Amino acid sequence: MNTQLLVTLLAMSIGGVALAAEIKMDDQSQLTQKAGKGAGESYFQPPQEKDLPANAYGELVQQGRAIFVDTQKYAAEYVGNGMNCTNCHLEQGRKANSAPLWGAYPMYPAYRKKNDKVNSYAERVQGCFQFSMNGTPPAADSHVINALTAYSYWLSTGAPTGQELPGRAYPEVPQPQGGFDIAKGKQIYAEQCAVCHGDDGQGQKAGGGYVFPPLWGKDSFNWGAGMHRINTAAAFIKESMPLGKGGSLSDADAWHVAAYMNSHERPQDPRLIEGSVEKTRLKYHANDGVNLYGQQVDGALLGQGVK
């Protein structure tokens, strides 16, 4: 992180002590929000690239954007699957209701139940590499983390610190009465999703890289990623999928297809305890939203992982 940015962040953190009572420090592991904006609310508007300064800071922001959009290329040594950051945080981390960076950065440091401690923003990004990217977290002072932090900081220009902005999460989608139906989800997947992600959920490649990410299997996110939760995946799908047709699926259909997606095997949770899926389920998954880790589906135990 360059000196000017570090000084700015330090000043912000010191200045924020007096406002600590106003800043919500609740669990940031699993964000929820009601769909849409409240009366009189509007979404935060991040700055445009044309407004970037032509200096070292602007260059670092551009490098962070490049890593975010093409993580496979610019942070390859830390990625263990076929995902890019922008696969989950759409429109280069700008899109409201898709966990935008401008909604996340101002909320850190924050407590996360996932690792039971207050996390810095760098630690939050490291977690994405470990779970969503099924890779190795870059060091907190690495160029990759510094660049991604600078990009997030820049997108948050003008955003209030410690305030939950409208659009910062995936809007919560209520579970259908009677629960999800994996068989229905399979049919919906074939009709709505397979054209991009493939009949087998393995995505599509062009020029050696994925243009549509794999949704399960060895090149997808692992069992520790937030998207393995059916409720989180349903919220993402309802809001933004199929691509360009967000909101076209019913709440129930979003749940059904999310359950189908997450009823397939994927890379192991890196927090695996003593080689035991059951011990790992009890410690990390039993109270983590709605998920199928450690559950039997069609006679198979999910959570054994693929390599």
UniProtKB/Swiss-Prot annotation:
Residues recorded as binding heme c 1, renumbered to this chain, are 85, 88-89
Keywords from UniProt, A to Z, are: Heme, Iron, Metal-binding, Oxidoreductase, Periplasm, Repeat, Signal
Q: Does the keyword Secreted apply?
A: no
Q: Where in the cell is the protein located?
A: Periplasm
Entry protein name: Thiosulfate dehydrogenase
What domain of life does the UniProt record list for this protein's source?
Bacteria
Q: Which Pfam families match?
A: Cytochrome_CBB3 (PF13442), SoxA-TsdA_cyt-c (PF21342)
Q: InterPro entries under this entry?
A: Cyt_c-like_dom (IPR009056), Cyt_c-like_dom_sf (IPR036909), Cytochrome_c-type_DH (IPR051459)
Secretion signal: which residues?
1-20
Q: Ranges for the Cytochrome c domain?
A: 59-156, 180-265
This protein's assembly is summarised as: Monomer.
Q: Which intervals of the chain form a coiled coil? A: none
The residues that hold heme c 2 are: 193, 196-197
Q: Which reaction does it catalyse?
A: 2 thiosulfate + 2 Fe(III)-[cytochrome c] = tetrathionate + 2 Fe(II)-[cytochrome c] + 2 H(+)
GO terms under cellular component = periplasmic space
